[in-house]
C-alpha cells in the first residue's frame, strides 16, 4: 500500500480544534488532546443549554406574571384561564414584560380579564 502523508491535513484539523479552545484555562487551550476533550464537552453543554434556556426563560416569565397578578388579587392560573376566556392573546413573554415595565397597564389587563 502507498504511504499517505497527511501532515498538512492533520495540522489543519488540530488547529481548528485549538482555535475553538482559545481562552480555555491552562493546557485545555494549548494541548491538542485536552483541548479536544474540552471542546467536545463545551459543544455538548452549548447544545444542551440552548434547549434549557427556553425552559428557563419561560419559568422566569411565569414567576414574574404570578407575582404581578397576585398583587392584583389573582393567581397565575386564574389569570391565564380568564385571559383565554376573554380571547386576549398576549403570550407569557409580553405579559411578563408588561408586568415589569408598566404595572398600571398590566393591572388594566387583569381588570379586563376578570370581567
UniProtKB/Swiss-Prot annotation:
Provenance organism: Paulinella chromatophora
Gene3D superfamilies cross-referenced by the UniProt entry: 6.10.160.10, Ribosomal protein L20 (1.10.1900.20)
InterPro entries: Ribosomal_bL20, RIBOSOMAL_L20_CS, Ribosomal_protein_bL20_C
GO molecular function list: rRNA binding; structural constituent of ribosome
Function: Binds directly to 23S ribosomal RNA and is necessary for the in vitro assembly process of the 50S ribosomal subunit. It is not involved in the protein synthesizing functions of that subunit.
Domain of life of the native organism: Eukaryota
Protein name: Large ribosomal subunit protein bL20c
Keywords of this entry: Organellar chromatophore, Plastid, Ribonucleoprotein, Ribosomal protein, RNA-binding, rRNA-binding
Record CDD domains: Ribosomal_L20
Gene label: rpl20
PANTHER family listed in its UniProt record: 39S RIBOSOMAL PROTEIN L20
Amino acid at each position: 500500500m502507498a504511504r499517505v502523508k497527511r501532515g498538512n491535513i492533520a495540522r489543519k484539523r488540530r488547529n481548528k480544534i485549538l482555535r475553538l479552545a482559545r481562552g480555555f484555562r491552562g493546557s485545555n487551550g494549548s494541548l491538542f488532546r485536552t483541548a479536544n476533550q474540552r471542546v467536545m464537552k463545551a459543544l455538548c453543554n452549548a447544545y444542551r443549554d440552548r434547549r434549557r434556556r427556553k425552559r428557563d426563560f419561560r419559568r422566569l416569565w411565569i414567576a414574574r406574571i404570578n407575582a404581578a397578578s397576585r398583587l392584583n388579587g389573582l393567581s397565575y392560573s386564574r389569570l391565564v384561564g380568564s385571559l383565554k376566556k376573554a380571547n386576549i392573546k398576549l403570550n407569557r413573554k409580553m405579559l411578563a414584560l408588561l408586568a415589569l415595565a408598566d404595572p398600571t397597564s398590566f393591572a388594566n389587563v387583569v381588570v379586563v380579564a376578570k370581567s
